[in-house]
Amino acid sequence: MIKWTEQAEIKLPDDVQATMENNELKIKGKLGEASRIFRDNYVKAYIEGSSVKIATSKNNKYTKGIVGTWYSETKLLIEGVTKGFEYHMKIDFTHFPMRVSVRGDKLIVENFLGEKSPRSAKIVDGCKVSVKGDRITINGIDKRKIGETAANIERATYIRHFDARVFQDGIFLLKGEVNE
């Protein structure tokens, strides 16, 4: 018989519901629903009352690291479904004016460094991207997906075969924050 000891507890706000099925924690709030799969042999997450608890069967550095990661992931899920997250990016160009637009699930960058063919970046499901002037705003409830979308946009404007000290064009992350 394995003895499980509780290591962390996250209290759920009143307007948030949580369910656990097959190692998948689903958090539902006023902005939507987010989920994360928590699977490990020595650490388990479960729901008891109005809180999410994380327990371990061993007490070592490995399991302490997993407990801390799962704790922060759960807090981010709760924060995402109650407040939401927002990333701000800046369109920066000096040589060639680029045109940025959103088409479906892609962000299209045209005339980047005078290139004839447009570059595209995938927008991950659950993210809303808007372009106003030289700013791009990414909104959503899952911080991982928003970060992945921001990374896709930055990677689409990566400069190769030019001197990066001279050609400083691109789209760069300014800040990521929680909506208030």
UniProtKB/Swiss-Prot annotation:
Gene Ontology biological-process entries: cytoplasmic translation
A Pfam family: Ribosomal_L6
Keyword Ribonucleoprotein: yes
Keyword rRNA-binding on entry: yes
Keywords of the record: Ribonucleoprotein, Ribosomal protein, RNA-binding, rRNA-binding
Disulfide cysteine pairs (residue numbers): none
GO cellular component: cytosolic large ribosomal subunit
Coiled coil ranges: none
GO molecular-function terms, A-Z: rRNA binding; structural constituent of ribosome
Record-linked InterPro entries: Ribosomal_uL6-like, Ribosomal_uL6-like_a/b-dom_sf, Ribosomal_uL6_a/b-dom, Ribosomal_uL6_arc
Family note: Belongs to the universal ribosomal protein uL6 family.
Purpose: This protein binds to the 23S rRNA, and is important in its secondary structure. It is located near the subunit interface in the base of the L7/L12 stalk, and near the tRNA binding site of the peptidyltransferase center.
Known partners and oligomeric status: Part of the 50S ribosomal subunit.
UniProt name for this protein: Large ribosomal subunit protein uL6
Species assigned in the record: Picrophilus torridus (strain ATCC 700027 / DSM 9790 / JCM 10055 / NBRC 100828 / KAW 2/3)
Organism classification: Archaea, Methanobacteriati, Thermoplasmatota, Thermoplasmata, Thermoplasmatales
